[in-house]
Amino acid sequence: MVVLMLREILKKVAHFSEQKPFLMLLIILIITVFAGISATNVKSQTAFEKMLPQDNPIIKTLYEVRDEFGGTDVITICIKLKPSDSSDKVVDIRDPRVLKAIKELEDNLRYVDGITSVSSPVDIIIQKNNGIVPNDIDTVKDILNKLPEDKRKRIFNSDYSMTVVNAYTDAGGDQKKLMRVMDDVNERIEETPFPPGVEVIATGTPPMRKLMDELMKESQSFTTTVGLIGILIILIIYFRKPLSSIMPLLPVLIAVIWTGGAMGLLDIPLDMATAGIGSLILGLGIDYGIHLMHRYDEERRKGMPIDKAIETAVVETGTAVMATTATTVVGFLALVLAPLPMMANLGKVCALGISFCMVVVLTLLPALIVIEERHIMPLIKRLKGDTQ
């Protein structure tokens, strides 16, 4: 009963796509435009605590600590010596020029919105020198020698080639705020006039989150592009016609855009699990297009007219595709039950993506086939005839 009902629905879809292919194309394109706009609202999520169950006592306590005592994330700014050809280069991190630059950097960081406090072990040297930076390295050494050994070890490393500045941020899981804070911190670092022979690098959890954000976006673009090119090459080898090779790929590409739109609409973030969703959907969804195209070509070789070949391909292939989609979606939706939010997000996105592949392939691909057969191919033949 259910199968018969599905076959009847598929038959109507096939007739609509065959009789009004341009209208079907227009409908799909309009939806795709809105999905593309929604996809721009997808947020990146690199906060480790957001990837864990939010009702866990450890995570709840973390949020309480942030609310009561401010930021818990530390940006560690490492100031260290580096090779330099300059005759004026720094050879000892205790150089007063370095200390003055550190003091200036600290003062500038305090004005960054989102930085709650800034501290450096070097501060104690300034305090011991009546609140000003010593003018010569010998004074710095004298102050250090008068300090207890445990304090002295926390200011510089053993060979006096490195020290750190710690900046505390209250950005927490707010991804946009953290990215803005890191941009401002890096800008302050660039503006600070450190002498030659000194390298300044921000590290710690916030900088690593920014790096992860950049790498996720880069990986998403790269893997999707590589997957797209690889699939296109295989389709060209299989179908041996450029136009027929592109057609099964277009619905899957549109499904990827729809998936991005759904992520923006449902507030599903781009995280470590969902970053590769584009290539994943391409790999899973292209099967549907290949099966439908192959069945259509098979029916045409038997001598069937376009309308009958489209109907047979959509109905016969469509029922199998819908069954395959249902089983795949159930498998992906099982991930929604996972305690890790990012695994649940992956399950949701994969289920949406493969469902969109099915819908777009069964509606748009028949319309594209009809447009190719009835409009594009005759036009190409006429153009070839005119040139001859």
Swiss-Prot record:
Keyword Cell membrane on entry:
yes
Q: Where in the cell is it found?
A: Cell membrane
Please report the record's description of how this protein sits within the membrane: Multi-pass membrane protein
- Transmembrane ranges, per UniProt, are 22-42, 219-239, 246-266, 273-293, 320-340, 351-371
Q: Quick one: where is this thing mainly located?
A: membrane
The record, for InterPro entries, names: MMPL_dom, Mycobact_MmpL, SSD
The superkingdom of the source organism is: Archaea
GO cellular component terms, A-Z: plasma membrane
Give the similarity note.
Belongs to the resistance-nodulation-cell division (RND) (TC 2.A.6) family. MmpL subfamily.
Protein's recorded name: Putative membrane protein MJ1562
